[in-house]
From Swiss-Prot:
Any one GO biological process: mitochondrion organization
Lineage: Eukaryota, Metazoa, Ecdysozoa, Arthropoda, Hexapoda
UniProt name for this protein: Prohibitin 1
UniProt signal peptide: none
Species of origin: Drosophila melanogaster (Fruit fly)
Family statement drawn from the similarity comment of this UniProt entry: Belongs to the prohibitin family.
């Protein structure tokens, strides 16, 4: 009896293990930010998209295909020409993600590596078409407008293939060596012209100052001559007295200066009898 009991327990355990293995092989998980499409060996890709969570499928008949639907970055370098035939090196940074409802169509037409098949194709096409409408200088001064136009046209093209572009930006923009040298030479010429203009303006200011100074001297001379004509020697005597007063004031402020009156008895003020 005991042997039969344990034999049954073993058989039940084996059955449970087999059943657990079968059930486990029929389960699959869809993580957050992902979606799944089911490939059936008899009917092909099913139209319904499976959301996040744990789901059942028929082993050996069905196969889940997982897609990441979160935004992913990609850089697309492009070499193209501007409207004035200048070589332009541009790097386009794109944030993209698939449209969940379009995943069965995306897998059927493009496969899981849809981004590798589509973005390197449509990004250069759109970018070259837009850049060809601008001169090299406009690409610098109107960079935001160029980026907006590329974003609009590229978004429309990407939607045709079943995915969304969340952000598009021009992260790198350089020109050929010839254009770079031309820009540098233009900047040097502008600096030299600015310097020359400053020198000319300075000379004009100096010339104007000299003219004003000469006019002032001439006017002062005229007034002085008029004063001499009206006052005669009195004005000269007044100026002499003013100059003498100024000299006396300056000497009075100096130390060690003695004042000697005019005359013969200037030393110690001695009487004349002693001198005899």
């Amino acid at each position: 009896m005991a042997a039969q009991f344990f034999n049954r327990i073993g058989q039940m355990g084996l059955g449970v293990a087999v059943l657990g293995g079968v059930v486990n092989s029929a389960l699959y998980n869809v993580e957050g930010g992902h979606r799944a499409v089911i490939f059936d060996r008899f009917t092909g890709i099913k139209e319904n998209v499976v959301g996040e969570g744990t789901h059942f499928f028929i082993p050996w008949v069905q196969r889940p295909i997982i897609f990441d639907i979160r935004s992913q970055p990609r850089n697309v370098p492009v070499i193209t020409g501007s409207k004035d035939l200048q070589n332009v090196n541009i790097t386009l940074r794109i944030l993209y993600r698939p449209i969940p409802d379009q995943l069965p169509k995306i897998y059927t037409i493009l496969g899981q590596d849809y981004d590798e098949r589509v973005l390197p194709s449509i990004a250069p096409e759109v970018l070259k078409a837009v850049v060809a409408q601008f001169d090299a200088g406009e690409l610098i001064t109107q960079r935001e407008m160029v980026s907006q136009r590329v974003s609009q046209e590229l978004t429309v093209r990407a939607k045709q293939f079943g995915f969304i572009l969340d952000d598009i930006s021009l992260t790198h923009l350089t020109f050929g060596r010839e254009f770079t040298l031309a820009v540098e030479m233009k900047q040097v010429a502008q600096q030299e012209a600015e310097k020359a203009r400053f020198v000319v303006e300075k000379a004009e200011q100096q010339k104007l100052a000299s003219i004003i100074s000469a006019e002032g001297d001439a006017e002062a001379a005229g007034l002085l001559a008029k004063s001499f004509g009206e006052a005669g020697d009195g004005l000269v005597e007044l100026r002499r007295i003013e100059a003498a007063e100024d000299i006396a004031y300056q000497l009075s402020r100096s130390r060690g200066v003695a004042y000697l009156p005019s005359g013969q008895s200037t030393l110690l003020n001695l009487p004349s009898t002693i001198a005899q």
